[in-house]
Amino acid sequence: MFTVRRECNNGPVAFDSRFHRLLLGLAFIVLCPVHSYTQSKALLEFRKLEQQNWLEHANSARVSTDQSNFDVRFYHLNLNLSMTAPYLQADLICRFNAIENNTAFIKLNLRREFTIDSIRGNISNFQFSLDTITVTLDRPFQAGDSGWVQIYYRGVPPVANGLKGLRYVTHAADQPLIVSLSTPFLAHYWWPCKDGPGDKPDSVLVDITIPDTTVAGIPVIAVSNGVLANVIQSNNKKTFQWRERYPIVPYYVMVAVSNYRDFHQTFTGTHGEQFPLDYYAFDESLAGAQLGVVDLPAAIELFSALFGVYPFRNEKYGMTELGFYGAIENQTNTIINTMDISWFWVSVHELAHMWFGDMITCKDWHHGWLNEGFATYCEALWAEHTGGFDLYKSYMQTLKYQDGGTVHLQDISNPFGIFVSIIYDKGAYVLHMLRGVLGDSVFFASLADYAANQNFRYGHATTEDFQVVCETTSQQDLDFFFEQWIYDEYYPMYGYNYSQNTSTGETNIYIRQLQADFGRRPVFTMPIELKFLFQDGGDTVITVWNNQQTQTFTLTLPKVISGFEFDPNRWILSTSQVVAVGRESSTLPARFSLEQNYPNPFNGVSNFELRIAEASHIKVLIFDILGNEVATLVDEVRQPGVYRIPWNSGANPSGIYFCQFSAGVFSQTRKIALVR
């Protein structure tokens, strides 16, 4: 058992993701001046690199091939690595079952830079082109038939976008490091496989042969997923035999080779489960790593209590230092830039993936929020665990995503169609809102039921699967919720007010949803909390069911109201402002702002929502990526209010543009994407 320490300096919150986290991050600098600042930078870097993952997937997905006719059951990867040059000699055994009758061939992914020396097994011949190995089988396979192939290959592993693949780099200036970075579709950059999230072999064996040597007086070792079964020494070489016996997607298979210093803990949970925590750090950062993982067992205990015991408890949980990049939730062995305390919130995120991402994997990247939104939400749950509900609420406000696009990704083959931060931030906020709709007990029971469901454990799930679990647990129809928050875009923009007859206590609450004025969904159906403050110092909270564009709710309150808070716990992703009752167009913004254009990306006309807090001479200008002004949308005095400003892109070519809104000393810029 482990005790969570709750002091400020042991539980700082990292507020970083995208630029709208900055203000709250500054507030926490006052409370935790050192740690919140360093964590903020760490998480910011992590998020940027995670966004790059999706762009890599979008490009890689274009060359993927139909592989639905077979199911991989087992891989055995045998790697022979040079420590002095980026060169790989290897072989792979793949065992599979045919899914369709008369299966004549199977296709595996492997980058074209490699040379295939031979293939044996159930094969008559093969072709290798366009990053695809097409193996013609030695007979027609019927559904359920088992087969195998063994591929011998060699070459220099290519690097994806200058960053990922099987990387040969150094740490401490000149000490070698070989490490794989394979998410979300890049395992085939270094080994043949059926890449992507859709296929999980039952187990993977990884043998890594390296020179038997030391660097800076420290032995070079090789680490991977699962359990180290054996180390064989022969002919001045060592072979590390790693065994992953749980189902795993190919891009979570990992290797890391360096002169690591390893240290260990043993986790003992409340259910009696016990497993090793194995850490691999560089000598120069060992002390910081040992300090940085002190609270990790407490995070494991928290997530085990919420979602069920750690899903890979028969093996381990490990973390391996990179010294660059961000982090990847490789199954049982997360790779991470550094394990020091400044990256602890990244460690929490990656740990959560062991339940949501590794154990239960999104069926395809349309449902990517089931991986990333869940892990991001777990950051907020850790904040709540260490700092209470107020800290949780504050953390959630750093995740408010108020741009366009759907959480269910529509187009995963087009980089412009992937709204990267939406699956992290809005995905997490969807769970926050679902908690508000269901209540704590039912919400957390739904998450636990989802994690325990045998249809998804060590397999795949879709958004529809998650919805069914929530509906079954809650005994509620949640179509309204998922339809508007997952499959539709944007958010409600509330105008509200109230009045009270102090003699009778009769109170009217007026709510109008304003977003239809900007071409968006006219009504979001949600329960809304309303908090009334009374002159005697008391308060009460009531919940109303808002399902119309304009609604008035009447109730009797026995005390005189002194104040009113709309959605005090911020359960709803929204904007809200006081409006004059009966004058629906009289919305008075409290601040200047330029909202993200919609649609975005767009072809033809896109609209901007402009909020003007006071009468001002304003300018709204469009610039291309080179800084050339291409359009003036507004250049005049405007009165306070909310305006919709269209831009007809005309003959402007596809590309990235910027919309700049200025009013006096205020200035704000939005990036927009024009796609022809």
Model-found features: residue ranges?
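Hydrophobic helix-coil surface modules that form long, contiguous segments used
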Residues: 90, 195-348, 377
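Short, surface-exposed loop/turn motifs with a glycine/proline- and acidic-biased composition
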Residues: 633-665, 669
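Zinc-dependent metallopeptidase catalytic helix centered on the HExxH motif
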Residues: 335-393
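Amphipathic alpha-helical substructures
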Residues: 100, 420-509
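Extended, low-hydrophobicity, Ser/Thr/Pro/Gly-biased non-transmembrane segments
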Residues: 42-62, 66-67, 93, 150-260
